[in-house]
Amino acid sequence: GFVRQGNAEDLMIGIHERPPIGTSFADQQSDSSLDDGSDVPYPFTSCDDLIALCEKHHMSIADIVWANETAMQSAVQVRSELDNVWRVMRRCVQHGCHTSQTVLPGGLNAPRRAPKMYARLASNSDVLARDKKRADAVLESSDAAWVDLFALAVSEENAGGGRIVTAPTNGAAGIIPAVLHYYWHFVDHANEEGVITFLLTAGAVGYLFKRNASISGAEVGCQGEVGTACSMAAAGLCAVMGGTPQ
């Protein structure tokens, strides 16, 4: 099973049991309805399958995933859940950058660094609170530093018991929000539809890792879960920047 962090607004969307030692989730799921794809119009179990579907039907990865998801639940529900993922990610980054908590819990007396880093990068101007993207020239001062900040803010929220999106795990939870915030704040044509495309595309990559290998740090180490998150984020960013499935 898993342990939930104690937030009153948390929504439990599923429970899985830890596979026996020496096996993976892929071993356990070989006969599951999720994997056989019987209930979706475009089933895929490998990257080759996914690319072939995109080429055959002239669809993007996000289109494929959207069609599959809306075959199992309404389009309104799917969109609502994706919007909520983005909403929680934004609130997490904002809270991580603005919190008054100075030391993380746990007894190690580890200081929170994101608030001071944010104040320094933003020249004490509350850039994240502004709806208009690229609203301040300070955003252009250091793209990489801002991405680092976004990831750090989420990681510190996780360590502090805040509300996060497991993307795909708690340990790697900062990577996808960081890259998605980069898109939102640094790309001129960024919009809500792009966010949805990003999340759908990233989800397809995460599914392939989950099905064929593992996203668990306990199974494949921290770099396994971080590598998965990086691949998901890279795919999402590629999709919204005009890249193709290939």
PLM-predicted stretches and their roles:
Residues 1-134:
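C-terminal regulatory domains involved in ligand/effector binding and gene-expression control
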Residues 210-246:
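C-terminal catalytic subdomain
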